[in-house]
UniProtKB/Swiss-Prot annotation, chains A, B:
Organism of provenance: Halalkalibacterium halodurans (strain ATCC BAA-125 / DSM 18197 / FERM 7344 / JCM 9153 / C-125)
The protein's name: Putative phosphoesterase BH1439
GO MF annotation, one: hydrolase activity, acting on ester bonds
Enzyme class: hydrolase
E.C. number(s) listed in UniProt: 3.1.-.-
Membrane-crossing residue ranges in chain numbering: none
Length: 171, 171
């Protein structure tokens, strides 16, 4: 079964992201707008409890932090993806690092670029037609993130939340 | 903002439900297959913490329980909805009752019929064409439910999980 770890921003930021995803992201209906903290990884059912425990520890070890979105950018030419760029923050980096440290596999393929995807699998023409205009857009939003989520993937490609983990120590 | 409380069954039951929802449920892409415990209700942001606290208490007060699905049925003529009928269970009824007891509003409109929707807003012809065949289907599935979820609705009608609540006392 495929699992992943993500954070869902607030409704206003999700609504804003969806206004783009609707047109540019074929995953629009598969999962709400999110910041991926750990790409899909395979897990046997018997491994789940120890992974849940580890994600809970990681979440407890990182305090709630400000998430700041400040522009539209692309991974082109690596991929034809459009995203809201997220300001680097030590807490966000720490979450990502911990989720890619033993017992989890490292991500050898990419280094962490905090982002919220608003378009993907675009043709070169779609990307270049829109990129200039979108890069000019004034995007400025800041909010506090206080939770992350572990999700699993259904056969139709959509994602269901398995568990929420609050950041920082329990009240 | 609209909130709701639901339980998501296991992946196998969700995949089975989606094989029907794909054809019969226009909400297919808005939310994964679920059992509604509390229909959408409006909440101001400042009311959220006390509601979260109350849902957490309710979840703690009910132990994990078996969820049994045993046939396809319909709410016709009240509504043209198709669903997997869920065997009544005191724990499930208790969750529903608590979520409709002060500070929450009672549901004056319907009494609780535990179900997992697989089709809705069907025309009379669609419903009657398929109902006989679906009612004959051998549906038999049982699993343990150990968590419920509080969700909120985005502007596009889709739902994001806000928080997971484990049933019973914390380990």
């Amino acid at each position: 079964m495929n699992y992943g770890v993500a954070l869902f921003p607030s409704k206003p930021l999700q609504d804003l992201a969806n206004s783009y995803r609707m047109r540019y992201d074929p995953h629009y209906t598969l999962i709400p707008p999110h910041v991926t903290l750990k790409e899909p990884f395979e897990l046997e059912e018997q491994e789940l409890p120890s992974v849940v425990k580890r994600v809970r520890e990681i979440a407890k070890g990182v305090d709630p932090f400000p998430l700041e979105v400040y522009k539209v950018d692309t991974f082109y030419p690596v991929s034809n993806t459009l995203f809201f760029k997220i300001r680097e923050h030590s807490a966000l980096t720490e979450l990502y690092e911990q989720l890619h440290t033993s017992p989890f596999k490292r991500n050898e393929k990419y280094s962490f670029v905090p982002h919220l995807t608003i378009g993907q699998n675009l043709s070169y023409d779609e990307l270049s037609d829109n990129l200039g205009r979108l890069k000019m857009k004034q995007i400025q939003h800041e909010e506090i993130v206080d939770r992350i989520q572990l999700l699993y993937q259904l056969d139709n490609g959509s994602w269901t939340v398995y568990e929420t983990f609050k950041l920082g120590k329990e009240e």
